[in-house]
Every structure is written in C-alpha cells, then in structure tokens.
C-alpha cells in the first residue's frame, strides 16, 4: 500500500509539472537584452526559452507592522513556461500596466481577490494595482521571500503582471532580468 501511494503521488507531481510546463533552468541576471533569447534558444538541448522580468517590490498595506514584499514576475505572451492555474478571476489585459494576478496563499492571507487593489512600491514609486485573478504556479508551490526560512504569505507574495508594465516600472524596456529554459529529456 505504501509503495502504491508513493508511486501515485510521484506520478501526480510529475504530471502537474509537465502539464504546467515547469522550467528546468532558472537564471537571474541584472539586465540582459531580450534579443539574447534567440541565441539561447538555439543552444543544443534547449526546447524552449523565455525572458522575463522578475523584480521585488514592497508592500504598502495598512495594519502591517513589519514590512512585506512581493515578487513581480512578467507574464508570457503565449503558452509560456511555468503556466498559471487560475483559481479565481482572469489574467490581466496584456496592455495594462495596472492589472495583476496574485498568488493564492498571499490572497488568502490578506483576504484579497479579483476587484481588490494592492498598494506596492515599485522601483521607489507607489502604485495601486487592480487584482484581476488569483492563481497557483508550479514555480511557487512554496514562496519564500528574501531572508525567509519558512513561507510567510502575510509578508511575502508573488504577483504576475504584463511585461509592458514591468518594463516601464523597472526601466527594463527591451530587456529582461530572468531567463527560464525547458531542456530536452
């Protein structure tokens, strides 16, 4: 019975990662031209490559004694790697600089959902963003903020936003700060 349960859990996890196109390689960079992606995609063994913007922002929520932060991750234009599973709402309009999707655990910890606004500091500027959806991601099953040993969804959350808005907020027009790759088996 124990081996059967383990095998079932192992297969379920593998299928979840496969269905949601979980990346094999994650690389942070300070700033790289997005045009570099074409060269990376040509490397032998790379099945798919995606250039993203991944940046920290600070939470500006009433009632929080200790500072909190969010990790902004740009949404891919197409099917993309590390697909989101929407629990509520919808994905942001790709042309919007104000719409976001937030991680499920973070949403529950703060009682937030579609239609609510989230106040954050992005690159030193305060912004109020409209939550359009709540999602799960294979990349952030356990979301750990800077210096955290254990997940604390009250103090750290993941926020997905359209690329254009993050490019403007973090002065990364035509650039990326993170690369993810799917490799051939």
In which residue ranges do the predicted regions lie?
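Membrane transport/envelope proteins' first extracytoplasmic loop
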Residues: 1-185
